[in-house]
Amino acid sequence: MLSGCTKEKQSVPEAAPSVKKEVVALSRVLATIADNEKQDAPPSHEYAESSVKPSSDMIIEINKYGNGVAYIAKIGERYCVVHNGKVGKLYDSIEGYTLILSPDGQRVAYGAKSGETSYVVVDGVEKGPFTDRGRIAFSPDSKHVGYDAKIGNNWYMYVDNIKNDGALQYFDRSVFSHDSSKVTYLEVTDVSGVYRLITSDLKFKQNMALTIADTAYAVNAEKTTVAAVEKKQTKWNVVSFDYDHPDKLKTGESYDDIKQLTFSEKGKSLAYIAVKEGKSYIVLDDKEELLPEGEYPWPFVVRPENRGVGIFIVHSKGKLTSAYLHHAFAPASQQNKTYKEGAHLTYSRDGKHHAYVAILNEKFTIVVDGKEGPFFDRVVYPHFSPDGKFLVYRARQDNRRFVVVADINGKIIKRLPPYERIFDTTFTEDGKSVAYGVKDGNQVAWKVEALQ
């Protein structure tokens, strides 16, 4: 047995019932990192997007409800995953981007290598050996896990311990349906780059195959609806279907090009950018509107209740860029202020208020309904409270990281305590407190703070 691989650690989070979707409303320690579990800075492409980039990085995943935590630790010259206090087996390497928690926080999976041999590790059990492997996904009920892996020259899609017939090229991006009874994944069958979108039962006995033109298919947040792009001769169109009736396809209008399939945060409203006769349009549920001239490289957002789309219009001149927020399918209004960049657009639940991150003179601010808040060295990911009366976001100033609570006008109500690292924010069920994970020294903790 390898030293340090099988012991049980302290500070184990309390067990959570299966798929508990209530945010933990009490502050508590989730994990205590042992002194011999070194932090090891990963390559820049593996920085966790869910957190502000810290001064020294450890790959950490925290359940969005506060019900579990996993991290990659370096012990000596090898690596292991610590999940809810249990230390896993040591490997030569563990790919940080593969580390994933189940929705209930009680299961963990990741990709690991010993020498040149790859494994998928699920709840401490090795799957393999493989010559390569892809990404991993848990089902919404946390009972199933899907991943793609290579044996010899063939790739296979797995759900739990069952694999499909395989393909010579690769599979990618398994997504489970809302009721965890079906799985959708991308299949490339030959070197010509023909993509097939497969929707199957979990035993790969019944499936529907759809030939598509792009790898970027989309699934809505509730995992009830799937959308992809078809190409017929020289024209492109969107096709979509519900998991409950995958055989009933809905086909959109034909365009010269289609990109950025985007669902609303809730529901089935679908938007995308389409090109027709050299002009760009934003299409929302089959309604189209001509976009202002410019570029549209950044993600856009569908407003709640199908009220329109918020999209940044970007203009480039050499190395200089400028951007402003455009509200499509909305009454004509004065153009929003131009900034160097705009990002992380969000709306209140009723769609009446919006906020986003803007950069001006190399400083960051949150713009709320067109009004600038205070400027910081960095701000990310604003979120409105459920009642739309408060806004919270993560900020960095003078190398200190903290959460800010602001009113609907962007005025700061309180600045919460600083920590070494802060993860994305959410709200307790009553909407009166903000909750988030932090790393501070050797502790990973769940913090809950009143909004006022």
Residue positions per predicted region:
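C-terminal motif of bacterial Sec signal peptides marking the signal peptidase cleavage site
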Residues: 2-4
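Non-catalytic tandem-repeat scaffold regions and their flanking low-complexity/translocation tails
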Residues: 9, 17-452
